[in-house]
Amino acid sequence: KKALALFAVLFLFSGHAAAGFDGYVEVTNNTGYDIYYLYVSHAKSDSWEEDVLDDDILPNGHTVRVNLRNAKSSIFDIRAKDEDGDTYTIWDLDVARHDVVFTLDDMD
């Protein structure tokens, strides 16, 4: 019975992973500066997607939820650009397991 239960759990997780990622990532700004642009692109992409903040800003100390629907995987590159034009990039992040907290240590 234990082997059957383990197989069922593994099957569920493998099926979910194969179906892709359908969720979100929370991005927190702890840089000390307001973030004016936020880009989230698939890790294998050669270019950045559109700014997900649109006309909004992400003030220092605040968090925004970015919806990621129908993604082929949960591995993303995430870049923020602050009020001074400085960029912060996190590469190859598994957003199914980790949210993002940008700090000055992430500055490019």
Label the model's feature ranges:
Residues 73-83:
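A short, solvent-exposed beta-strand micro-motif common in secreted/extracellular proteins
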Residues 33-37, 88:
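Short acidic/proline- and small/hydrophobic-mixed sequence motifs that coincide with surface turns
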Residues 87-108:
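Extracellular beta-sheet/turn segments enriched in Thr/Pro/Gly and aliphatic residues
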Residues 1-7:
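Sec-dependent signal peptide recognition
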Residues 25-32:
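Asparagine-centered strand-capping/turn motif at beta-strand->loop junctions
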Residues 46-72:
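Intrinsically disordered, low-complexity Pro/Gly/Ser/Thr-rich segments with frequent PxxP/GP/PP motifs
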Residues 21-25, 64:
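Structural beta-strand segments of beta-rich domains
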Residues 12-15:
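N-terminal signal peptide c-region/cleavage motif recognized by signal peptidases
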